[in-house]
UniProtKB/Swiss-Prot annotation:
Organism expressing this protein natively: Arabidopsis thaliana
Low complexity composition-biased segments: 1-19
Domain of life of the native organism: Eukaryota
Glycosylation: residue positions: N125, N151, N189, N243, N408, N409
One GO CC term, this protein: membrane
Name this protein carries in UniProt: O-fucosyltransferase 9
Gene behind the chain: OFUT9
Region called Disordered, residue ranges: 1-33
Transmembrane regions listed in the UniProt entry: 65-85
A Pfam family this chain is assigned to: O-FucT
Length: 568
């Protein structure tokens, strides 16, 4: 073994701070005095003018500065009252803050839907076929195409040792760990051992790597660039008494730079012959040299394909969606609907405002996050979360948005989701708007799904494949699933994500207006669709992930030999 790495002469960056892929904590309320959506201008009330007058007196007359604390408290009380806040003390230092009457702060979408439904039902102008065919405007002159081979170097002849990682989380968190591990193994000129999957307490899926991904194809696809083995050789295992846990587990910083790996990990690898990182999640910086980025591209977009049982059923499901959507040229819409109980609970948003819902959500938060939401000083702001676009969209809101964009009741819609919170109640309006709606449970037979039951990652792989091949993909909330899927769609569809990411701040404002006109709502939704089309092709920024933005690291811009023409 030798100490050569594959960093080359490329410079490396230090640690990069980027937003966490998991859902953020509740945001602070943003007090603004700008124009509202309806164009109204905020005016100062009598209470606020009194507060400012008192403060001006204090700062002009130094003799009354001792009264400042009392005046401050009195002013804050007036301020809170004038802005319409209600504070509910839950005890143990936890408070829920409501801001009464703020546009968009309350879930009023069912009232809007009930009033608009007769108009929506009667609106047959245009056809869903045309919307599906014309949702994405033709690209002209040039397109983005995969060009991974130009950025990837060959594997070294002599390995520096064995690199072992443990991947945790759900399907796409594991995918992230695998692809980054390939890049690190290439950087260190190490042999990668097929990653070990950790049994996650949330996902509860005991699947191994080979149950989800095609092991043999993974090894073959990487063979020219990174050495991969299914398990450690017998002589190495003997040194550690056949116990992988005895191998040194390195604790690495999040978002570590290539230089960090060469300075801290490579010497240990050369000395010991094998190193382990458990867990290995978000342990490599986004900005690395081009040939290391190329390994990420190769692993994610080419080497990782699902295991044959998943692949075969997923292909059948896609074929069935295409057959059912024959009237629209085999095109369909897929929606990643994040309205499971854990997502609703974590968001700290409210929907029916009943005591039963509150108790249910409190219990769900305690089960999943053990006191995180009961810490002293924690302030929960459901209204502010909704105004700020942090609340998961309900099935009803997704349906209204799509109908407003022009997708009518003949549109075939596939919903990718886990167990929807109160599914009978919340899914009914979406089915009413889109009666041809499909899920994996309606698209596949119980016998076909039986081997996948109890394995959330394998079920997610079925959803991933059906969404990947849809004409339009709708992402309703953040997370690793849409992040990877959007990047994969860009890789397949000439750089365009062909994805709708709703402007939820705008949407909650519109759905807070019971008197809103259907034609006005439609115009706003169609503007939103055009905006998503315009943002479909985006290059990766320094602090962004190539798994979502594969250009320019994994794709090259080329002239389009067959430019698409506008049917008009």
């Amino acid at each position: 073994m030798h100490g050569l790495s594959r960093l080359g002469n490329g410079s490396s960056n230090g640690r990069i701070n980027i937003p966490s892929p998991s859902p953020p904590s509740s945001p602070r309320i943003r007090h603004t005095r700008g124009k509202s959506l309806a164009g109204g201008v905020y005016k100062q009330g009598l209470g606020e003018r009194l507060v400012f007058l008192l403060f001006s007196i204090v700062f002009r007359r130094k003799g009354v500065l001792l009264l400042a604390p009392l005046l401050y408290i009195a002013g804050m009380l007036l301020f809170m009252g004038s802005f319409g806040f209600t504070v509910l003390d839950l005890g143990h230092g936890v408070e829920i803050v409501y801001r009464r009457g703020s546009p968009g702060s309350v879930y009023r979408s069912p009232k809007v839907f009930k009033r608009l439904w007769p108009v929506m039902e009667a609106d047959v102008n245009g056809s869903s076929h045309n919307v599906l065919m014309e949702a994405w405007k033709p690209r002209v002159k040039s397109v983005w195409k995969p060009c991974i081979s130009t950025n990837v170097s060959a594997a070294g002849s002599n390995s520096n040792g064995y690199f072992i990682i443990e991947a945790n989380g759900g399907l796409n968190q594991q995918r992230l760990s695998i692809c980054d591990a390939v890049a690190v193994a290439g950087l260190l000129n190490a042999t990668l051992v097929i990653p070990i999957f950790h049994l996650n307490s949330v996902w509860r899926d005991s699947s191994k790597f080979g149950d989800i991904f095609d092991e043999d194809f993974f090894i073959y696809a990487l063979s020219k660039n990174v050495n991969v083995v299914k398990e450690l050789p017998k002589d190495v295992l003997e040194r550690y008494n056949y116990n992988i846990s005895s191998i040194v587990n390195l604790r690495l910083k999040a978002w570590s730079s290539p230089a960090y790996y060469l300075q801290k990990v490579l010497p240990q690898l050369l000395r010991l012959g094998a190193v382990r990182v458990a867990p290995f999640s978000n342990r490599l910086a986004h900005a690395v040299p081009a040939h290391i980025q190329g390994l990420r591209c190769l692993a994610n977009f080419e080497a990782l394909r699902f295991a044959e049982p998943i692949r075969l059923l997923a292909e059948k499901m896609v074929d069935r969606m295409v057959t059912k959507s024959v009237e629209s040229g085999g095109k369909y819409v897929s929606v990643h609907l994040r309205f499971e109980m854990d997502m609703v609970a974590f968001s700290c948003c409210e929907y029916d405002f009943g005591q039963a819902e509150k108790l249910e959500m409190d219990m769900a938060r305690e089960r999943g996050w053990k006191g995180k939401f009961r810490r002293r000083g924690r302030v929960i702001r459901p209204g502010a979360n909704r105004i700020d676009g942090k609340c998961p969209l309900t099935p009803l809101e997704v349906g209204m948005m799509l109908r407003g964009m022009g997708f009518n009741n003949s549109t075939l819609v596939y919903v990718a989701a886990g167990n929807i919170y109160k599914a009978d109640k919340y899914m009914a309006p979406l089915r009413q708007m889109f009666p041809l709606l499909q899920t994996k449970d309606t698209l596949a037979t119980p016998e076909e799904l039986a081997p996948f039951k109890g394995h959330s990652s394998r079920l997610a792989a079925l959803d991933y494949t059906v969404c990947l091949h849809s004409e339009v993909f709708v992402s309703t909330q953040g997370g690793n699933f849409p992040h990877f899927l959007i990047g994969h769609r860009r890789y397949l569809y000439k750089g365009h994500a062909e994805t709708i990411k709703p402007d939820k701040r705008k949407l909650v404002q519109l759905l807070d207006k019971p008197s809103i006109r259907w034609d006005y709502f439609k115009k706003q939704m169609q503007d939103m669709l055009r905006h998503n089309d315009a943002k479909g092709v985006e290059l990766r920024k320094p602090a962004a992930s190539l798994y979502t933005f594969p250009m320019p690291d994994c794709m090259c811009k080329e002239p389009d030999p067959e430019p698409e023409t506008d049917p008009a």
